[in-house]
């Protein structure tokens, strides 16, 4: 299993701008061009993959971000998701999609960092 070692150790504060890394959460890349894929994801996650550029769909547990015509990124809304739950999700997706040649499932949790920006100068 992945071991998260963040290079960002503290919150950065500037004039009316705060920058902090969001705690590491599971991120899984999905790729498929099969029709059955959307239905299968809908059953597993209770979310239908978005089919328009730069859109997302989600529920209380997960968000699904459209990356390209045949690519999506799942990330968890639950910062407290246990390692067992993360492993179970990845295994379920792998068994239901990759093993059945419906698409590709890749854990990219260590490839992406989520950063929270807040303050009056976020849009400057």
Explain the meaning of each model-derived region.
Residues 1-124:
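Basic, glycine/lysine-rich polyanion-binding surfaces/domains
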């Amino acid at each position: 299993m992945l071991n998260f070692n963040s290079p960002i150790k503290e919150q950065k504060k500037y004039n009316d701008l705060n920058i902090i890394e969001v705690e590491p959460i599971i991120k899984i890349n999905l790729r498929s061009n099969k029709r059955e894929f959307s239905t299968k994801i809908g059953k597993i996650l209770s979310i239908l993959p978005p089919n328009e550029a730069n859109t997302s769909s989600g529920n209380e547990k997960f968000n699904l971000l459209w990356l390209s015509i045949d690519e999506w990124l799942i990330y968890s809304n639950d910062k407290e998701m246990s390692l067992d739950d993360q492993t179970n999700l990845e295994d379920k997706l792998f068994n239901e999609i990759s093993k059945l040649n419906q698409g590709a499932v890749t854990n990219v949790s260590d490839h992406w960092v989520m950063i929270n920006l807040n303050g009056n100068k976020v849009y400057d």
